[in-house]
């Protein structure tokens, strides 16, 4: 069974980049009848908060990305300790006593020689007596994972294709701090093994991490999952944007963006498939394949999202929005108004046009025409086709046509020059209210 996981750190809110990661993990699991897991990587106990965790859950709920199970790394420290001891017994983790200042000095020396900042494994050469002396000074060791320099790192990425890393060109990663707390690398692997994760979907900034973690999977005697490393998002101008890092679900809600619009865009940008409006995210499962994703950065354009949002609103059924519409608006009202909306909450303004008071600046030369219109509106059959009947009668009586025929009527009846199709809107306004508005505009 396919098992994916979304593993945010609850040190902040979700932004558009990790919303995209969550979506693709969810889509891959759902498209293959698998499981989608939420894992809160909260090993940073100082910066992780329950408020942020709650906001992550709420954002996933708003998007409809409901996980099949949830776990918190802070509840799993005993498991990490157990697996760490296995690695320690194998000699695959080792204690290091350098201070941050000493490590920085080593990096500067290497940089001055034009060499990459690879850890020199000096800690492996320490004698028991030297370790004892360091600890007598009060130094507590941090721990590194010992990479196997004789095992080249290779995998076939679902997006990037064949990948190769030389472990001799990588530093042994620190997996545990001197205070005993955990860094990201090892707990992530331990959890992926324990949770049966089959596919790890994340950003391309994790490619080197994957190379390191593949050796951890092997050291722990576990099969490696498949990996898909996605190109990063850039703004509409084609550059990394600070704004993208601040765009989250709250911002999208404030813009009136429908969850399905955000999903429809993020599901397709960066792929060979066109971005299309859908009313149900399930329609996007067919054809969702990491082989369709390119390696070029994916452009996220807020204007494109807003345009897509409007197209989706124009196809949403009444049942999907009924709870967000103004009191009294029925299916006929929604279907009449929705072609003119860019966001659902604009419906209230158009419903006020139907039921509330309207006013407009009427040209003096149109007042007599509107008086005729009031009489004609009172005389026609309102059962069906009221707008067509009204304009036909007025055209025949006055000789007006085009804008001169229609615009004064729309202004008098709605107070606006543009809006929904009057064939659909006029029956909602109703005969009595329409006659009253026409007479008021004529006076």
Curated annotation (Swiss-Prot):
Keywords: Aminoacyl-tRNA synthetase, ATP-binding, Cytoplasm, Ligase, Nucleotide-binding, Protein biosynthesis. GO terms for biological process: glutamyl-tRNA aminoacylation. HAMAP family: Glu_tRNA_synth_type1. It is an enzyme of class 6 (ligase). One of its GO terms (cellular component) is cytoplasm. A motif ('KMSKS' region) lies at residues 239-243. It comes from Rhizorhabdus wittichii (strain DSM 6014 / CCUG 31198 / JCM 15750 / NBRC 105917 / EY 4224 / RW1) (Sphingomonas wittichii). Belongs to the class-I aminoacyl-tRNA synthetase family. Glutamate--tRNA ligase type 1 subfamily. This is Glutamate--tRNA ligase 1. Its EC number is 6.1.1.17. It catalyses: tRNA(Glu) + L-glutamate + ATP = L-glutamyl-tRNA(Glu) + AMP + diphosphate. Pfam families: Anticodon_2, tRNA-synt_1c. InterPro entries: aa-tRNA-synth_I_cd-bd, aa-tRNA-synth_I_codon-bd_sub2, aa-tRNA-synth_I_CS, aa_tRNA-synth_I_cd-bd_sf, Glu-tRNA-ligase_bac/mito, Glu/Gln-tRNA-synth, Glu/Gln-tRNA-synth_Ib_cat-dom, GluQ/Sye. It is found in: Cytoplasm. Monomer. GO terms for molecular function: ATP binding; glutamate-tRNA ligase activity; tRNA binding. PROSITE patterns: AA_TRNA_LIGASE_I (PS00178). ATP binds at residue 242. Its main location: cytoplasm. Gene3D superfamilies: 1.10.10.350, HUPs. NCBIfam families: gltX_bact. A motif ('HIGH' region) lies at residues 8-18. Catalyzes the attachment of glutamate to tRNA(Glu) in a two-step reaction: glutamate is first activated by ATP to form Glu-AMP and then transferred to the acceptor end of tRNA(Glu).
């Amino acid at each position: 069974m396919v098992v994916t996981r979304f593993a945010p750190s609850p040190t902040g809110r979700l932004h558009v980049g990790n919303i995209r990661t969550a979506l693709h993990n969810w889509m891959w699991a759902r498209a293959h009848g698998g499981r989608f897991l939420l894992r809160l990587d909260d090993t940073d106990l100082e910066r992780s908060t329950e408020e942020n965790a709650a906001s992550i859950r709420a954002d996933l709920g708003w998007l409809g990305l409901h996980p099949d199970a949830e776990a918190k790394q802070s509840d799993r420290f005993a498991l990490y300790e157990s697996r760490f001891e296995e690695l320690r017994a194998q000699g695959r983790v080792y204690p290091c006593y350098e201070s941050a200042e000493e490590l920085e000095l080593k990096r500067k020396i290497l940089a001055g020689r034009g060499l990459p900042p690879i850890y020199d494994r000096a800690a492996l050469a320490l004698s028991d007596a030297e370790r004892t002396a360091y600890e007598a000074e009060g130094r507590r060791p941090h721990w590194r994972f010992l990479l196997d320099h004789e095992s080249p790192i290779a995998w076939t990425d679902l997006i990037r294709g064949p990948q190769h890393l030389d472990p001799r060109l990588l530093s042994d990663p620190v997996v545990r701090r001197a205070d005993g707390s955990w860094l990201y690398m090892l707990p992530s692997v331990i959890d992926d093994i324990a949770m049966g994760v089959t596919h790890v979907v994340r950003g391309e900034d994790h490619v080197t991490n994957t190379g390191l973690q593949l050796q951890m999977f092997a050291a722990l005697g576990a099969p490696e999952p498949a990996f898909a490393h996605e190109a990063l998002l850039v703004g509409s101008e084609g550059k990394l944007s600070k704004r993208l890092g601040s765009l989250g679900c709250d911002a999208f809600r404030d813009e009136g963006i429908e969850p399905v619009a955000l999903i429809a865009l993020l599901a397709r940008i960066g792929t060979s498939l066109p971005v299309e409006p859908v009313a149900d995210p399930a329609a996007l499962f067919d054809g969702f394949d990491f082989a369709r994703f390119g390696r070029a950065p994916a452009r996220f354009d807020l204007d494109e999202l807003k345009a897509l949002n409007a197209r989706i609103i124009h196809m949403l059924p009444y049942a999907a929005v009924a709870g967000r519409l103004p009191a009294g608006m029925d299916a006929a009202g929604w279907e009449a108004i929705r072609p003119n909306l860019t966001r659902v909450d604009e419906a209230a303004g158009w419903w006020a046009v139907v039921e509330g008071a309207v006013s407009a600046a009427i040209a003096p030369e149109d007042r007599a025409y509107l008086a005729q219109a009031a009489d004609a509106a009172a005389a026609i059959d309102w059962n069906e086709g009221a707008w067509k009947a009204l304009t036909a009668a007025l055209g025949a009586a006055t000789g007006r046509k085009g804008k001169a025929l229609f615009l004064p009527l729309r202004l008098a009846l709605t107070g606006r020059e543009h809006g929904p199709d009057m064939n659909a809107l006029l029956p909602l306004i109703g005969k009595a209210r329409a006659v009253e508005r026409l007479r008021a505009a004529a006076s």
